[in-house]
Amino acid sequence: MKGYAALGIGKHGWIEKEKPVAGPMDAVLRPIAVAICSSDTHAMHGGAGELINVILGHETVAEVTEVGNMVQDFKLGDIVVVPCSTPNWEKIALQQRNSNNAHDEGLMASFKFLLSKDGVFAEFFSVNNADANLVLLPEGVSVDAAVMATDMMSTGFYGVEMADVQLGDTIVVFGIGPVGLMAVAGAKLRGAGRIIAIGTRPNCVALAKEYGATDIVSYKDGDLVEQILALEGGKVDCAVIAGGNAASMNQALQIVKNNGTVANINFYDASETFNIPTYDWGFGMSDITIRGGFCPGGALRMKKMLNLIKNGRIAPEKLLNYKFEGFDKIKDAFILMDEKPKDLIKPVVHIKW
């Protein structure tokens, strides 16, 4: 079969591989829509170590082509939504207290695509524990909306969940790329009173306002911390870091109240280091909670995301502002995401077989 792969650090292209075979609890699928994520390009450039001949991609809606003999809930021809994180549910690590199912066999190990197996930019790909990880595409939910639920929406919302946004809170969202935009939307759904979004690109700013941002702050207008403190007349209740660099953590700690929360959903390079001045963290006595996490996976999580879409609570498909047709266009969409033109939010590729 054909797939689009990382071929070493900074290298990518088409390769041929053997078609996967479904294990007893697994399914083999072929994508009908895929979205390109900055994590795909980041991985290709060696952000998590060198990948050689590893098929990329982790955001997809797909058709079931094979199921294992223990799979009960899916059959050939079903159109399903595939969460980006597909835990091995039998792993004992998922039974730990306060366990996030993203870490079934180690750090982020439930994120099988890219980390331990080929991804979805292929004619066929496999999903482990199909009954516990896949979800039938609900009637009334578009393929475009569903493919955005698999990662962008789930990840952005997880940031808001970690931040523990309460009714009437003021929240700051660092970065309004696709994940940050979903954090803005999630904060509105959770009842935030004021949502301050940090970003500069005009189309992202416009969409942030549509999703619920009440204020936009730009580094081009001066020091971010000073701007936010002036806007709020003091510190804010919580912050979600969905973009930026290690310095964003320092900025977040400077703007969040005592007893507040800083939630990080931004992936950092191994070369980056947090250097937190003790004053920013109240000499270690501020009771500010610092959390960072990878979005949960599995069918139940995805059903909840799709329920919000089906009932008109959110329209994540608005993130998709570049659309391609045909499997071979994955290459063009990948290059686009790697180059990141200023007007890009998110590309999708629709596939007909």
Please identify what each model-predicted range represents.
Residues 88-174:
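NAD(P)H dinucleotide-binding glycine-rich loop of Rossmann-like/cofactor-binding domains
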Residues 1, 222, 250-254, 298-353:
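C-terminal hydrophobic helical "lid"/dimerization subdomain
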Residues 228-237:
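A short acidic, Gly/Pro-enriched loop at the edge of an enzyme's catalytic core
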